[in-house]
Amino acid sequence: GLDFEVIDHSGAPSGGRHIVFLNPWGSPYTASTKAFKLCLDEGLKSIAFTKSRKITELMYSWLIDASPENEGLVSSYRAGFLPAERREIEQRLFSGELNGVISTSALELGVDIGGLDACILAGYPGSIASTWQRAGRTGRQRQDAVIILVGLKDALDQYFMRHPDDFFARNHEAVVIDASNAAILKQHIPCASAEIYLRAGDFVYDTQALAPVITELETSGLLKQGKTGDIWFSQQRYPQREVSIRGIGKIFNIFSGGRRIGEISGARIFKEAHPGAVYLHKGRQYIVQELDLENFTIHCKEADISYYTQAITSEETEIIKEVLKKDNINWGELRTTHRVTGYWRKKLLTQEKIDRYPVELPSWTFNTQGLWVILGSNLKQIVEKNNLNFAGGLHAFEHAAISALPLPLFAMCDKGDIGGISYPLYPQLLPPAIFIYDGYEGGIGLTKRGLEVIGEWLEAAKKIITDCPCEDGCPSCVQDPQCGSGNDPLDKKAAILILEEIKAYVPEKL
C-alpha cells in the first residue's frame, strides 16, 4: 500500500475575502435583505443564507416587493421544494442565469453552484465550520469576495458581535455523534444490510449489542434472518429510499388545488402546517386548510395576505432513568412531550403580533438524553426577598444556558439542537428543576459532552447575560424568538442570582 499523506490546508482556488460584521439597530432580516439587494445592484452574484425555511421565503418576498426587477433573476431555495424545482434552481445558478439565491443550509454543501461574489449570512449559522463552509461558496474563481455576517437579536450572535476576536480565533468544531442511537440504528441497519448482510461476530457491527434493535427490525419485517441463524439481510432492495437524511419522521406531501407543491416532515408538520398556518413557497402564500394525519397529506389554498404565522407550543419532561449523578447535577434518559396549542399571526413587514388563535392537535413525544439541575427549595425565598420573579429567573437562565452551550463545547452544535424546560416546582422531584436536553430522538451526546465542561458552560451563560447592557432582558441575552411560551415570564436579574447560586455548588467538571 501507499503511505498516508497529511492534508492540513485547503488547496481550493480562492481569492481574498472581506468579512463584515453587521449588527443593525432594527430588524436583522430587513438589514440582510437590504444588504443582499445592494450586492445585486452592484452586479455581484450573491447568495444569502438563513436559519429557517420561513425566513428564506420572507426575505425572498421582501426582496421582490422592494425590487420587482429581480423577479426571475433571484430564487429562494430550501428543503421541502420538489426535486425537479431544486435541480432547476441549481442549474440556473450554475449557468449564471440567476444573479442570486436565498437559501437555508440546503445549499451549504454537496451542490456545485459555480462562482459567487457575495455571501450574506442572516444570522450566525451555529458553528464555525458552517460559517466558513457557507462563506466558501464565494471567491472560487480567485476573485475577491465579500461576506457579511448579520447579527440576529440572539444571545450567541450578539456574543460574537461583541467578541469578534473570539470568532476568528476558533477552530472548526468536532462532530458529536452517538453510534448507539436506536432511532438512527433502526434506519441505518436495514440500509447497511441491503449492501452487505450482517453476520454474527462481525468486527464492524456488534450484533450482540445490536440484538434488541435487530429483533425489533425482524418483528417489523424490515430484516430477515438467514437459514444458518447467524446472518441478517434487508427485506427491501432499496431501504435507503425510505430514509430522510434531514431528520427522523414521516414525510407529508403538501397540495394546493390538487397540485403537489412541496413536502414537510418531523415536528415541522405540527409547527408549520397546522390548520390556519401560512405556508410560504417561492414567494407565494398558502393557508393550510387541512392536516390529514392518516394519509400524510396537507391541503392548502393560495392567498394574498399581509401576515405570516408562528406556532405557540408547550412541553413537558419526564425522567426515565438517572444514569449519572453528582451533587445536584444529574444526567440520563428523558421523555419529552410537545404540543402546538395555538399560533400568532404577525405582520409580514414589521413582524408585529396581530392576534392569537388556538388549535387542537395531538402531541408528539420522543425519548432523549439530557441533564437536570435540582435547585434548593430555599432559592425561591432568596430570589423573592430581592423582589424578583423566581419562575422568570429559571426561564431566563434556561434560555441563556441553551444559547451558551455551543461556546465551550467546541463541537458542531446549534442552539436549535438543544431543548430546555424549567419548573418552579417539578412534580417528579418537588424541588425546582431545570432541564436541558438533546433535541433529537434517542439523544446524540451533546448534553453529556456539556457535563464535561459544565464550569465553562455556566461561565459562558453568565457572560451572555452580564455582557448585555439591557436592564430587563432582551433577545440578545435571555429572550428566545422561538420560545413556545412567548418569553413569559422572564427575569434577567433573577437569572443572574440563580446562576451564581448554581455555580457555588457545581464542580468545574463531572
Range-by-range predicted roles:
Residues N23, S67, L405-L407, Y423, ...:
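Intrinsic-disorder/low-complexity coil detector
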Residues P68-N70, E384-K385, E508-K509:
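Short, glycine- and charge-enriched coil/turn segments that flank and shape catalytic ligand pockets
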Residues A145-I147, K153-N171, H188-A200, L210, ...:
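Extended Lys/Arg-rich polyanion-binding regions
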Residues C468, G473-C477:
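Short cysteine clusters
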Residues D480:
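Cys/His-rich metal-chelating microdomains
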Residues C483-G484:
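Short, non-ligating residues that shape and space the ligands of small metal-coordination modules
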Residues E501-L510:
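Acidic, low-complexity intrinsically disordered tails
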